[in-house]
């Protein structure tokens, strides 16, 4: 069969790498792709939001399955566009992708269906938000309602900071229309865990847990980013947590969306906070996480195309997901200065060191070919270096060793990805 992936980041490279291993797939395309994806797929120069061209291309090439990676096209109706043209596509329709595209929608859904989450209020006017902050307990969390590249969440320790945050989101429009409406919610403490799942509209199958590192600098300092590294599984995601979430979070979310007439097919990524009073939902994403995908898919044993098709066909109940009994760590190599100002166009050396290295992977997030055919940097997050190991500590050691194999002019990384592994009472 012929498959088209929409996207061009590290997440899509991991998906493309996984799809390329399926014996079912004879031809793989990716639009727009990147220099790493070009190793496993034919890259097509069409932007992720250019639905007309994407649908036309899929029609011309007789594509059997489309996989939409990023949140923006999903929220804007990419799946609807392919479906309307009679093309099989994996991902949620626009009316279901709202689960991620509107924080206010997801909070209201959780409240209505008693899915555990932080207490919150929603505001459309900065004046009302500021008035509310006069008496609200600190610290507090502000969230832009719309999509903001994973950066639209502000944790404010003081009232002054919170008021400044309202100004940033609603008046200065740092994230554009995403901040027209904001959610203000109570600050929760605990361990954060990400859990990825496949959904076919009624059945949900949990993949495995992971833990992201959002801040740009070591020690969880600096600005929020799209993610600087991750590990899987999370040692804090215990059997007790899993049992609780299956009963009160996972299936109830799928059932709630169905009850609202917004049947969800695709990936639901649950951002959880493990609080003293039990697990609570921090956020939903309606797609694979980035860089979580880069540690989850290398551990997955299934043919991913089988799972994609089962989600599209509503037969996910017949699939048993299987994961290796090991661990993986991904360290993101970024351009120095990310997520603010950084230079691009540096030549990347050493990528061939990963060829034939079992258990070591380099997933390209921001790379392209220059006019001489060299692979150069082309984004804030450039590469995700993933390594597996029998334990989390071994995987972490392997991942950091592999970061030394590649070089580019302004290479930057966090040196403490997976530090929480050392904080676990039990040896993984």
Task: Identify the residue ranges that each predicted region occupies.
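Short acidic-hydrophobic, aromatic-tinged amphipathic segments that line or gate anion-handling sites
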Residues: 43-49, 121-125, 156
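Solvent-exposed alpha-helices and their adjacent loops that cap or buttress functional pockets
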Residues: 20-21, 36-38, 60, 90, ...
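ATP-binding N-terminal substructure of ATP-dependent carboxylate-amine bond-forming enzymes
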Residues: 1-94
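Active-site "cap" helix and flanking loop/linker of ATP-utilizing ligase/carboxylase catalytic domains
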Residues: 246-268, 285-357, 370
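Internal nucleotide-binding/catalytic subdomain
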Residues: 153-293
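Generic C-terminus detector
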Residues: 367-372, 376-428
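A conserved helix-loop-beta module that forms one wall/lid of the active-site cleft
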Residues: 90-152
